[in-house]
């Protein structure tokens, strides 16, 4: 396995797919990186030369990926919570942040149902 940005990327997959294993790189960014490096998208990782891998590493080093990106996202959420914005409050309560309905759905964000016991009559 080749190692790029601290991530082992699979050798048997196409390069454009393998790069998406890195947090912060999706299909579009992977295609842009390969175009800039002059590498075909259809090439398998095992067929890349050290020179091509070096070019790809250099380009990805300029991008914000993995730990740096995760840290930035968590700091952004922390900032929203600290300033007391609506989005920050939704994050704190564990509810959907982007205006989705939360009366019936939103189970992923709210977690499993907590049933409330009925009072005895």
Curated annotation (Swiss-Prot):
Key words, A-Z: Ribonucleoprotein, Ribosomal protein, RNA-binding, rRNA-binding, tRNA-binding
GO molecular function: rRNA binding; structural constituent of ribosome; tRNA binding
Protein's UniProt keywords contain rRNA-binding: yes
One Pfam short name: Ribosomal_S13
A GO cellular component annotation in the UniProt record: cytosol
Biased composition regions of type Basic residues, renumbered to the chain: 106-121
Keyword Zinc-finger annotated: no
UniProt-listed GO biological process terms: translation
Subunit structure: Part of the 30S ribosomal subunit. Forms a loose heterodimer with protein S19. Forms two bridges to the 50S subunit in the 70S ribosome.
Record's function text: Located at the top of the head of the 30S subunit, it contacts several helices of the 16S rRNA. In the 70S ribosome it contacts the 23S rRNA (bridge B1a) and protein L5 of the 50S subunit (bridge B1b), connecting the 2 subunits; these bridges are implicated in subunit movement. Contacts the tRNAs in the A and P-sites.
HAMAP family listed in its UniProt record: Ribosomal_uS13
Similarity section: Belongs to the universal ribosomal protein uS13 family.
Full protein name: Small ribosomal subunit protein uS13
Species annotation: Bacillus subtilis (strain 168)
């Amino acid at each position: 396995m080749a190692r790029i940005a601290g991530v082992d990327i699979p050798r048997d997959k196409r390069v454009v797919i393998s790069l998406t294993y890195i947090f912060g790189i999706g299909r579009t960014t992977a295609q842009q990186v390969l175009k800039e490096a002059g590498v075909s998208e259809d090439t398998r990782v095992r067929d890349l030369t050290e020179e091509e891998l070096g070019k790809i590493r250099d380009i990805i080093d300029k991008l914000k990926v993995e730990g740096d990106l995760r840290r930035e996202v968590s700091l952004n959420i922390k900032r929203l919570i600290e300033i007391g914005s609506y989005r920050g409050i939704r994050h704190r309560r564990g509810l959907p942040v982007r205006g989705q309905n939360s009366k019936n759905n939103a189970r992923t964000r709210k977690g499993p149902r907590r049933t409330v016991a009925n009072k005895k009559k």
